[in-house]
């Protein structure tokens, strides 16, 4: 199964997104918080993201979700440092909708690439007809 990592500047936000998404989880795969889970601080760093990717990997790759700014930079750096060891990619998707879509679709041996497409399609969800 594809692992999933959520990287947010707020650990509490990432944890709540993960808790909510787990309600839709159909298979056994890892969903990890890539933030600084040991401290109640805001921000991200490369080491925490890298550790979360390693923990989430079950051999089929890891899809990483980020909120903004340094989370994007740190996730890219962490992925680069793991190149050749773990296939990890960032989903260019809204954080909440993307994670929920990916968790709900992560079953039946879906590939990392297929899951990324599904997550990124969440950018097109309309919340209003106006």
Please identify what each model-predicted range represents.
Residues 2-130:
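N-terminal loops that bind phosphate or other acidic moieties
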